[in-house]
Amino acid sequence: MVGRPVEPGALLQGQTVTVPITALAAGGDGIARLTDGRVLFVAGAVPGDTVEARLVHLKKDHGFGKILQIVQASPHRIEAPCPVAERCGSCQWQWIDYPFQLEAKQRQVREALEHLGGFAEPPVEPVIAQPRPFGYRNKSTFPIGRDARGEPVIGYYQKDSHRIVPLDACPVQDSRLDPLLAAARELIRTQGWSIYDEKHHRGALRHLGLRIGERTGQRLLTFVVNGQTLSGIKPAAQALMDRFADLVGVCLNTHTERGNTIFGPQTRCLAGQDFIEEVLDGFRFRIEPTTFFQICTSQAEILARLVARGADATAEQTVVDAYCGIGTLSLPLARAARAVVGIESHVRSVEQARQNARINGIENCRFLAGTVEALLPDLRADIVVVDPPRKGCDPEVLEAILHAVPMRVVYVSCNPATLARDLKRLVAGGYCLVGVQPVDLFAQTHHVECVATLERS
């Protein structure tokens, strides 16, 4: 069978092109335009760069390129402080100066609202910057594997792969976690524990989890295993506790299923306690190994205050906090509201939320286990706060909100695309978008958090 003849000048996969980078895509890649009109996505490229790139994959209307060399560097390009930044898949923007990162994130939110939400002039404020663009992460989870020599390695996955890039330290995480990373790696090497092989679903150690209270300094270390016991793990855990003064606990999480989920359903404490405490907006929260808590405490505090300001609750009003987690938004909301009702499908988070309310002496909060669409119709909801996962709200949740007819909705989102989609539905249902405030919780990455406020028309 004879293939279709290639037109003169046609671009082919594997070909090298020199292109100017004009923008950043929502996923963090640089964007260029090929001579045939197709969009080219180039990982690691910065607007203002001119790069020589290999066409590694071509589709009908777009393609993907790999940088071979930077012909001319953008004025926004800087030297990445991390020695493995170009290989590690955790950070996409370490080589972009921070002010330009913030501009790009604001543009990303605005364009999502315009193109996906249909808002002509969306009221998007400048992004609230992180005071420390490095060393801000209060949580890290590292896959554990073996290198080509069979030695244990701990690090992050290389972009678009499951090859582990070994790390001695991570400049994005709180530097107080770096010694724990080094100690865990040495412990795994000396103990000779078996390492999980995801291809054959064999071996014990899968992940290492680290947490720290930014304000309290308390640290927690968790080994994730594939259901197998680790010889000598309890005395090893106690030795870690004795070595590090602020290490309050060492835990073992069991995860026996295949797949990319990091933690399994069972966690037990090997030494010390199974939680750290953190202070946010004047409240004290207990955080366990698998608890969801924003990865930058100082920015999470700003987020909580923005939500409370957007809700603008009075002593006569009830606020429903949908997807409430452990109550990090509920408790600050309770200062002004008559009552706050938190809804959360994860039962352990509901138990923790109730515990956090008790610890802080909050009596006008109650927490319900279940789905928003099932529970909201039976509740008084003068104001609704939603903080869904990246996929956004299910259609049934949006319909439940509209049927509750709250006077105000505050929507917290980590995904501008699903935020735009859901705001479009709420506005069509009778609400007016008052404002969108992006907050940078994820410096050196393309991710951005937003707080959107809507009022009933």
From Swiss-Prot:
Binding site for S-adenosyl-L-methionine: Q294, Y323, E344, D387
Entry keyword Ribosomal protein: no
Record: residues binding [4Fe-4S] cluster: C82, C88, C91, C170
InterPro entries per record: MeTrfase_TrmA_AS, NA-bd_OB-fold, SAM-dependent_MTases_sf, TRAM_dom, U5_MeTrfase_fam
Record: active site: C414 (nucleophile)
Pfam families in UniProt: TRAM, tRNA_U5-meth_tr
Keywords associated with the record: 4Fe-4S, Iron, Iron-sulfur, Metal-binding, Methyltransferase, S-adenosyl-L-methionine, Transferase
Molecular functions (GO terms): 4 iron, 4 sulfur cluster binding; metal ion binding; rRNA (uridine-C5-)-methyltransferase activity
Disulfide bond entries: none
EC number per UniProt: 2.1.1.-
Domain of life (superkingdom): Bacteria
Enzyme class name: transferase
GO biological process: rRNA base methylation
Family to which the UniProt record says this protein belongs: Belongs to the class I-like SAM-binding methyltransferase superfamily. RNA M5U methyltransferase family.
Name of the protein described by the UniProt record: Uncharacterized RNA methyltransferase gll3134
Source organism: Gloeobacter violaceus (strain ATCC 29082 / PCC 7421)
